């Protein structure tokens, strides 16, 4: 190997040390399932999307089994606007008419999911896109929103009632990376758009995942947002449940997903900053990690 200067030699040495530091984490996670909720800037910034896809391929080639769950709220909003379809929200949820659902299905599986599958597959034949409709992966239950203290109908919006992981296990056994779009039928076969945070937690719990990672647009969990000194490195489920009512509205579904996962047997859940390139590898394979780690009380 040619060495052209001290800076390059130092850089090479640092890279070797980083790889060596990853060894115990690679051993711990080898053969384990890691569920990753893919959202936020990581979905819209081209550099971050490519880095995320590379992270998934890296994990797969290290013998770790990533499972990706994604939503696509901003992309759905953009397509509805482009098509001139009214977009209404109640209680923080998109009112999903049959017309809006058709757009959501097109965007989630046909656009967001396909783009990520293609980015991962640039590294090898790894990723397979599926939805909650495939092989009855998810069964949805209709949900409502609370507006002014009253339950309000929001259309074809659901929560996860049941999970059938057979198809995902088949993909994992074949060393593929499932990329899951969050659409699911109810017991009568009526398709609903389901919250991706909820879906990721339910899938992690049912798969017996080692970790659940939630990508966000903040550095982690703040107890007093936006005071930077209130960023939490680690918190248990009991303390987090007490903190839940005080959190910003956008963080609540992610925290609820973390709580569901760790109380359901997942050893740890992590809220990490998806704006950071290779944030998944930083969290999983370095001593310092990133974001906030949630564990059971």
From Swiss-Prot:
Which Gene Ontology MF annotations are present?
Answer: acetylglutamate kinase activity; ATP binding
A cellular component term, taken from the record's GO annotations: cytoplasm
| Gene3D superfamilies in the record | Acetylglutamate kinase-like
**What domain of life does the native source organism fall in?**
Bacteria
Q: Where is this site: Transition state stabilizer?
A: 37, 254
Q: Is Nuclease there in the keyword field?
A: no
Pathway-wise, it operates in: Amino-acid biosynthesis; L-arginine biosynthesis; N(2)-acetyl-L-ornithine from L-glutamate: step 2/4
Q: Kindly state which reaction or reactions the protein catalyses.
A: N-acetyl-L-glutamate + ATP = N-acetyl-L-glutamyl 5-phosphate + ADP
Question: Which UniProt keywords are listed?
Answer: Amino-acid biosynthesis, Arginine biosynthesis, ATP-binding, Cytoplasm, Kinase, Nucleotide-binding, Transferase
Q: Which InterPro entries match?
A: AceGlu_kinase-like_sf (IPR036393), AcgluKinase_fam (IPR004662), ArgB (IPR037528), Asp/Glu/Uridylate_kinase (IPR001048), NAGK-C (IPR041727)
For this chain, the annotated S-S bridges are: none
Q: What class of enzyme is it?
A: transferase
| Residues involved in substrate binding | 72-73, 94, 193
Please name one Pfam family that this protein belongs to: AA_kinase
| Location relative to the cell | Cytoplasm
Picking any one GO biological process from the record gives: L-arginine biosynthetic process
EC number(s) stated in the UniProt entry for this protein:
2.7.2.8
Could you tell me what this protein does?
Answer: Catalyzes the ATP-dependent phosphorylation of N-acetyl-L-glutamate.
Q: Which family does the similarity line name?
A: Belongs to the acetylglutamate kinase family. ArgB subfamily.
Designated name of the protein:
Acetylglutamate kinase
Species, as recorded: Mycobacterium leprae (strain TN)
């Amino acid at each position: 190997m040619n060495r052209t200067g001290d800076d390059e030699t130092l850089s090479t040495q640092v890279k070797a040390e980083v790889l060596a530091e990853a060894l115990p984490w690679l051993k711990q996670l080898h053969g384990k399932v890691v569920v990753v909720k893919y959202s936020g800037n990581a979905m819209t910034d081209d550099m971050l999307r490519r880095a995320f896809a590379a992270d998934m391929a890296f994990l797969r080639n290290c013998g770790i089994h990533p499972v990706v769950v994604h939503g696509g709220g901003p992309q759905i909003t953009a397509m509805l606007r482009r098509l001139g379809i009214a977009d209404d929200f109640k209680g923080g949820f998109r009112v999903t008419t049959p017309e809006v659902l058709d757009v959501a299905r097109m965007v989630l599986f046909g656009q967001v999911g396909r783009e990520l599958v293609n980015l991962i597959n640039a590294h090898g034949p790894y990723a397979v896109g599926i939805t909650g409709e495939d092989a009855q992966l998810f069964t949805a239950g209709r949900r409502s929103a609370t507006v002014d203290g009253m339950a309000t109908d929001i259309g074809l919006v659901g929560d996860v009632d049941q999970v059938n992981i057979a198809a995902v296990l088949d993909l994992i056994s074949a060393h593929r990376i499932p990329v899951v779009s969050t659409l699911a039928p109810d017991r009568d076969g009526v398709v609903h758009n389901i919250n991706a945070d909820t879906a990721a937690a339910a899938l992690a719990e049912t798969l017996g995942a080692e970790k659940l990672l939630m990508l966000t647009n903040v550095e982690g969990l703040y107890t007093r947002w936006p005071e930077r000194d209130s960023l939490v490195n680690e918190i248990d489920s009991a303390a987090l449940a007490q903190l839940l009512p005080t959190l910003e509205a956008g963080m609540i579904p992610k925290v609820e997903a973390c709580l569901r996962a760790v109380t359901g047997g997942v050893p740890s859940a992590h809220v990490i900053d998806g704006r950071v390139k290779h944030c998944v590898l930083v969290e999983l394979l370095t001593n310092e990690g990133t974001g906030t780690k949630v564990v059971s009380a």
